[in-house]
Amino acid sequence: MAEEHRLQEPRLCANNCGFFGSTATQNLCSKCFRDLQHQEQNSSTAKHALTQSLAAVGAAASSSVSPPPPPPADSKEIVEAKSEKRAAAEPEEADGPPQDPKRCLTCRRRVGITGFRCRCGFVFCGTHRYAEQHECSFDFKRMGKDKIAKANPIVKADKLEKI
């Protein structure tokens, strides 16, 4: 019974950090064990990257005329998405002259913090805050249709079971 008690008594961390370790974590405390795993993971990824770069250099040396490999499909999609966002943002920036956000766009009255920001992106006073008053270019009908379409997806007949 004394031997069983000795097996279960806590052991100090193998790194002598002052905390207790367990046999499941190689006699390390949880923090030291986590650090050890992190170091092993970093070294394995570094070795993997090194072998890939050496293989790429060897392949490039053997065929100096070969074209560069195409980028992965995911990066193409990301580049296309970024270019679409930039294209969509450019016309908005080019539409109006640089404006002072503290003045109404229509009457140029100072509004300060009491100004109303419209969905078209401009600031208006209390008189011109409504879309009809400042000839808003924002398409509220399209926004409403998009919200309804998003909230109520189309139910396809082939997914429903017939009674």
Curated annotation (Swiss-Prot):
It comes from the Eukaryota. Zn(2+) 1 binds at residues 13, 17, 29, 32. Transmembrane segments: none annotated. One of its GO terms (molecular function) is zinc ion binding. A zinc finger (A20-type) spans 7-41. Residues 74-89 have a biased composition (Basic and acidic residues). GO terms for biological process: response to heat. Zn(2+) 2 binds at residues 104, 107, 125, 128. A zinc finger (AN1-type) spans 98-144. SUPFAM superfamilies: AN1-like Zinc finger, Glucocorticoid receptor-like (DNA-binding domain). Keywords: Metal-binding, Zinc, Zinc-finger. Zn(2+) 3 binds at residues 118, 120, 134, 136. May be involved in environmental stress response. This is Zinc finger A20 and AN1 domain-containing stress-associated protein 3.
